[in-house]
Design a protein with these regions (language model features):
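Membrane topogenic/interface segments and analogous intrinsically disordered interaction regions
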Residues: 1-273
Length: 273
């Protein structure tokens, strides 16, 4: 006697029109993005090792030129046996992060894009394309004022005294100065982004201009610990200019949004001439 097995009705796979991913899928995606970023950073760090000596000589050039102008010689010291090796590793890591930045920045962007709306994607892409050139411009400005800071700091050393410079501390000082100024140049872009997202209005940003200028001056004073007026002004002026430029862009954006809202709420004939 043959028995016919009851067949269970096939369940169709549920469609996901919103494009949402499960937690496990997110973790797998994150793992893949991190793995690709790590490979790019490791390869770039290996390349950075071969140029680390050239980078160190380039970083040493400003203080050597200042010392030569004063009839002195600048010598960077390594207080430990492995100090020179550790410094080259640190330089290689920094160079590797910079060289691999297009890869790991893209991986971050590719991970975030599926969860963004079209509007957020447009604003985010505009922010990235604007922030990256400004960041490198800020780094260049920090490198430009660095010799002035070195010259002023070393001028406090008497003629009968000598400065023993720790190479690692010197490198970290240069790196922090360049990065801090680079980040400062990007801050106005954050203001524009917050305005486009509807968090801050253009007039609200403009009304805080006195506080902003005071904060910028204090920031440049901290970024240039020598308290050199020339260096402070060289850093403060472009940041202040970028702040007011951000205010102008935000105000223009608010006006465009207001006009669109008027057209949406009423007919064109209702608009003022």
């Amino acid at each position: 006697m043959t028995s016919v097995a009851s067949k269970k009705p096939r369940t169709k796979r549920s469609k996901n029109p919103d494009g949402r991913m499960s937690l496990g899928s997110h973790l797998i995606e994150l793992r893949n993005r991190l793995f690709k970023s790590a490979i790019a950073i490791v390869v770039a760090c290996i390349a950075g090792w071969f140029v680390s000596e050239w980078v160190f000589e380039s970083l040493k050039a400003p203080i050597s030129e200042v010392a030569a102008s004063q009839g002195k010689e600048a010598i960077l010291n390594f207080p430990t046996i492995a100090g020179a090796f550790d410094l080259r590793l640190q330089i290689a890591l920094t160079v590797g992060l910079v060289l691999a930045s297009p890869v790991w920045l893209y991986q971050i962007w590719a991970f975030l894009v599926p969860g963004l709306t079209r509007k957020e994607m447009k604003y985010g892409l505009g922010f990235i394309l604007t922030a990256i050139p400004l960041f490198f411009a800020g780094c260049a400005a920090g490198w430009f004022v660095f010799p002035h800071i070195v010259e002023l700091l070393t001028s406090f050393t008497g003629s009968d005294a000598a400065s023993f410079l720790d190479a690692k501390i010197y490198y970290e000082f240069v790196l922090k100065l360049v990065l801090v100024v680079g980040i400062a140049f990007v801050l106005p872009v954050f203001l524009v982004l917050l305005n486009f997202l509807g968090v801050l209005s253009g007039m609200l940003i403009l009304k805080s201009w006195r506080l902003a200028i005071m904060a910028i001056v204090l920031f440049t004073a901290v970024a240039t610990p020598a308290a050199d007026p020339i260096s402070m002004f060289l850093l403060a002026i472009p940041i202040i200019f970028l702040f007011f430029l951000a205010c102008g862009i935000a105000i223009l954006h608010d006006r465009r949004v207001a006009k669109r809202q008027l057209v949406f709420d009423g007919s064109p004939s209702d608009l003022p001439a």
